[in-house]
Design a protein with these regions (language model features):
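C-terminal transmembrane helical hairpin of 12-TM major facilitator-type secondary transporters
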Residues: 311-359
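C-terminal membrane-cytosol helix-exit motif in multi-pass small-molecule transporters
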Residues: 183, 212-233, 420-427
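Extracytoplasmic gate region of multi-pass secondary transporters
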Residues: 48-53, 246-299, 356, 360, ...
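Hydrophobic core of transmembrane alpha-helices in multi-pass small-molecule transporters
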Residues: 122-138, 339-354
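Glycine-rich segments within core transmembrane alpha-helices of 12-TM secondary carriers
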Residues: 137, 157-183, 381-391
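Helix-to-loop junctions at the C-terminal end of transmembrane segments
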Residues: 81-94, 298-310
Length: 438
């Protein structure tokens, strides 16, 4: 029979016989490894957010604005590098690039573990560290631009939904595990961590970083065995010009930025926000709920869009819901009612989950050409990731300027309303649909 490398060299996912006999198995192996690697990347990307709220109790002395800036840096770096990462699988090979981009993450993970144990670590050092953590956030673009190429068009939506949705769940995984890890003396002794006493408890902050070393090494080993380099068309500058000259690129970017930007931004800022507004609530133990809901509903959003044959409808309704929940979060802060505030935060994550899955399903339908749609997928994901930077930055800025949070929610709500209008204008009103616009 044909060797694995021969099969991969002549990849034909749209040929049913090839797909059943060879394609499906190899595609699924790549999807599983890619998804686990991406999940770990999201864990590392949000590693800082789980530690940030504890830093000052552990003997550091940072201002509120500094803390929000450090929380925003992984988003800034992750988003900016997504533009570059989108093209790397085509240039260096998907397997090679996944390996390189994952092994790099060992640097910030190990370094951060040592840095948080030393209270003389400077703000500048933490800026470098949080920037390196940001590399993890860029992996989403290369991962999403690559993995779809293994699958026939009829299964791309589901494959991208699994890769992106399960990958996003890394945020809830780290939010869920970090408090346990930080409280575990057993892990602390394995890693040789000196505990800090916070509110009378021994806390091992460094555990939250060191715990990712072994999983990263394991997935790197599995990659060498179960991933492949698909031969891909090399992107040329002409393709890029085609993308940027097209109004649909910008319309879809806005839609996805609104939904994913809200998701990643709230996920990064919520812990600090609750610490400021509801200091009496032990939030760390439930911080994972919102991101879990959003990540879990993302594949459902994609599936529902396939089912009713319209990503537009799912996106439009979700965005309207997002407007309502954003306004109501501010009301919850006003009433100082934590259960209401938390319920509205979760509702925000619900809307974001549906909208992110459905918007990504719109892209291959709006753009017929597979190369264009994979480049646009990468571009849209890159721009949207700035939400993870801008949202915490807005909160930090508004606190230092006004001393309360309302102006921040006003800005976010205005942005949501503009997005709903754009979605309506381009894809919802009479005679418009997402099919084959380009």
């Amino acid at each position: 029979g044909a060797s694995r490398s021969e099969i991969v060299a002549n990849w034909q996912p749209e040929n049913p016989e090839f797909w059943e006999k060879f394609g499906k198995k190899i595609a699924k192996q790549n999807l599983v490894i890619s998804t686990i690697a991406l999940t770990l990347s999201f864990c590392v990307w949000y590693l800082w957010a789980t530690i940030a709220a504890q830093l000052n109790s552990a003997g550091f002395n940072f201002t509120t604005d500094q803390l929000f800036t450090l929380a925003a840096l992984p988003g800034l770096v992750g988003a900016t590098l997504r533009f570059v990462y989108t093209y790397m699988p085509a240039l260096l090979g998907g397997k090679n690039w996944t390996f390189i981009s994952t092994i790099i993450l060992l640097v910030p993970v190990v370094w951060l573990g040592f840095a948080v144990q030393d209270t003389t670590t400077s703000y500048a050092t933490f800026m470098i560290l949080t920037a390196l953590i940001g590399l993890a956030g860029a992996n989403f673009s290369s991962s999403m631009a690559y993995i779809g190429n293994f699958f026939p068009k009829s299964e791309k939506g589901t494959a991208l939904g699994i890769n992106g949705g399960v990958g996003n769940l890394g945020i809830s995984v780290i939010y869920f595990l970090a408090p346990f890890a930080m409280g575990s003396a057993a892990l602390g002794s394995v890693f040789g961590v000196t505990p800090t006493i916070i509110k009378g408890n021994a806390v091992y902050l460094a555990n939250a970083a060191f715990m990712w070393v072994v999983p990263l090494v394991v997935i790197l080993a599995l990659m060498t065995r179960f991933m492949d380099n698909l031969p891909l068309e090399k992107p040329n500058p002409k393709n890029l010009v085609q993308i940027f000259g097209n109004k649909h690129t910008w319309a879809l970017t806005l839609l996805y930025t609104c939904s994913f930007g809200a998701f990643s931004g709230y996920a990064a800022a919520l812990g600090l926000l609750v610490g400021k507004e509801f200091p009496e609530i032990p939030f760390a133990s439930i911080a994972f709920v919102g991101p879990l809901v959003a990540g879990a509903l993302r594949p459902v959003g994609g599936w529902l869009a396939d089912k009713i044959n319209s990503g537009t409808k799912v996106t439009f309704i979700s965005l309207i819901g997002l407007c309502a929940s954003t306004a109501l979060i501010a009301v919850g802060v006003d009433m100082h009612n934590f259960p209401f505030f938390f319920a509205m935060s979760v509702l925000t994550f619900v809307c974001c989950g549906f909208a992110t899955g459905a918007t990504f399903r719109m892209i291959p339908h709006v753009f017929g050409n597979p190369l264009l749609s994979s480049l646009i997928t990468g571009f849209v994901a890159a721009v949207a990731a700035y939400g993870a930077f801008i949202t915490p930055k807005i909160f930090g800025f508004v606190y230092s300027m006004f001393g309360n949070i309302h102006p921040a929610f006003a800005v976010l709500l205005a942005f949501n309303i503009v997005t709903v209008a754009v979605c309506y204008w381009f894809y919802v009103r009479k005679g418009r649909s997402e099919e084959r616009r380009v």
